[in-house]
Regions:
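Extended Lys/Arg-rich polyanion-binding regions
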Residues: 1-216
Length: 216
């Protein structure tokens, strides 16, 4: 008789500022004497959308079909229109770590906390035409300093994937970096390796219809 598996569910939470790295795909976090690695995104709560990101300023907006994209509405950059400035992004609410309980346990010999590093960026988007109430600068050419008072600003912190030195670069808000993103199955939310065998949940429809993987 085969031994039956017992499924145990534990829930942990982090602030958004911590979770964007600690609960990011392929990263591991340590709790209750265990090392848990994130391997799946909950797609029932995540919001997917295509965003256009300005290479020159911090402006970003959801891509809309038929909308004029010839120049950034904030800074006027013509590079805003480049197709490469559009990325599909997920607003993640919940992730999973599916692991064997015994394998997740750590001891003194295995407690090497090697965390994954990510390419992250905080975008501070301000409508300069309507939300800057006043601005000041030093009247001294040798000491260039100024500041602005703004009524409101939109802050977006984006995780663009694991840090890497090689690959195609993308400029966002004046910063050019390799931004590989994450490969996630759109049917089951399992994190896919950059190279190697695909990884899917037992209930993923790609297991019954493998052609779905080729279609993507």
């Amino acid at each position: 008789q085969k031994k039956k598996y017992e499924k145990m569910v534990y829930e942990y939470s982090r602030s958004a500022s911590s979770a964007i790295s600690e609960f990011a795909p392929n990263n591991s976090f340590y709790v209750d004497g265990r090392k848990l690695t994130i391997d799946q995104v909950d797609l029932t709560t995540a919001q997917a959308a295509r965003w256009r990101l300005c290479p020159n300023c911090s402006h970003a907006q959801i891509e809309e079909m038929g909308k004029n994209t010839s120049a950034c509405p904030q800074c006027g950059s013509s590079a805003w229109a480049d197709a490469g400035q559009v990325r599909t992004m997920l607003k993640v609410q919940m992730v999973y770590s599916n692991m064997d309980y015994t394998k997740s346990l750590i001891n003194d010999e295995s407690d090497d906390r090697n965390n994954v590093f990510y390419c992250k960026q905080l975008l501070v988007d301000v409508d300069e035409d309507h939300d800057i109430s006043s601005a000041y600068r030093m009247d001294n050419e040798e000491f260039p300093f100024g500041y602005e008072f703004v009524r409101k600003a939109t802050l977006r912190e984006i995780n663009f994937g694991e840090s890497d030195m090689t690959g195609e670069k993308l400029s966002v808000s004046g910063v050019e970096e390799v931004r590989k993103g994450f490969r996630i199955c759109k049917y089951c939310g399992k994190i896919q390796p950059q190279n190697g065998k695909a990884n899917h949940s037992f209930a993923c429809k790609t297991r019954k219809i493998p052609a779905l993987m080729q279609a993507d």
